[in-house]
Amino acid sequence: HGNRILIINNGARQTGQQWATDHAPEVDINESGNILVIKGADGVRYGSDALGGIIVMEQPPFAFGQEHPKGRIATFYGSNGHRYAATGSLEGTLPFLRNIAWRMQGTYSNSGDRSTAHYLLNNTGTRGLHFSASAGYDSGRLRIEGIYSHFGEQTGVMFGAQMGSEDLLAERIRLGRPVYTDPFTRHISYPYQKVVHRAAIGKVRYNAGAAGVFYWQTSWQKDDRRENRIRRMNHSDIPAVALLLSSI
């Protein structure tokens, strides 16, 4: 996505470290109730930096007035990498104040080595743990919302992708496959990438009648990315790249 596609997540610009083609947005689509893609002139309202368009992700509306909590659970399985995932959410209101609503949501995913048609891609497993909590208050004229989300993912990098020299890379390309392949495993070893993205968003909307509608929003995001490679002298546990990005 880089700097050509803008992501609006729950009303806030998604700010991650967008400097590599293998860095996907740090968002959990299961958290969203509505995803909208905007292209063309309509995207000007979000700024001039989104040349490729805008992806707007919004959480479902709060269940104000709902008497009993309700939830959902969904599971997923993928044959390539024997990936499985589970996501669930629970929402409701306070028993004594139905105009105060809350929601909790979480997703866990686990994948092992991926494969092509003829061989395994060792060390390409993934682990993901994402969760969010939100609450809202609605008095008719005044609405207040608060959202906190945590996105955590670890992704293995295929052993054959880290080459010691250009000659070795040329040899692997000529062979058309890795020299050695191990049996399937879910274990993630070096090299790998690990990212943790945290976000907190606050919104206030007040309807002043004839004076108009006033809207205020603020957000805080913190993106922690670490990339570990196979290093000599047992120093693989020291990240080759460790970047921390905070934004308000």
Which functions belong to the PLM regions below?
Residues 1-4, 9-248:
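Outer-membrane beta-barrel proteins, especially TonB-dependent receptors
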